[in-house]
Design a protein with these regions (language model features):
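Conserved nucleotidyltransferase catalytic core and NTase-mimicking acidic/glycine-rich helix/loop elements
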Residues: 5-128
């Protein structure tokens, strides 16, 4: 096919940092709502895992929305971050209401992913 995975399949790259910041701001609002916190956790962790594939999709020449293949492809390109991404995958499937667990992953893997996106694709990152 003439379709080539890459930036044209990268819906989340330009706004990913905004998603991370939004969730970090919303966590205190969900402290007394465990179900809401789990929904928030599941949403942002799915976003992290899928965005990780967008980061390497052009190089890997792959695209999928399935979470485990997103993780597998990312782990091949960034083995040093594979364990953290696997944790994000686990939380995408089995979300937690533990704000500290969510915040810790956002502050480490989420911020690193934002930096890596900005480094690799400075022309597509939308700054707030």
């Amino acid at each position: 096919p003439s379709y080539r995975p890459g930036r044209d399949a990268s819906a989340h790259l330009p706004i990913f940092h905004k998603d991370i910041n939004l969730v970090k701001q919303e966590i205190p609002d969900f402290m007394q709502d465990p179900l809401g916190m789990k929904e928030l956790c599941g949403w942002i962790m799915r976003r992290i895992v899928r965005t990780s594939l967008e980061l390497i999709g052009e190089d890997a020449r792959v695209f999928t929305r399935d979470l485990y293949p997103c993780y597998e492809h990312f782990a091949r390109y960034y083995p040093a971050r594979a364990a953290e991404m696997y944790r994000a995958l686990e939380l995408a499937v089995f979300p937690t209401s533990d704000a500290k667990v969510i915040s810790d992953l956002l502050n480490d893997l989420g911020i690193w992913l934002c930096s890596e996106i900005a480094r690799k694709y400075p022309d597509v990152v939308v700054r707030s």
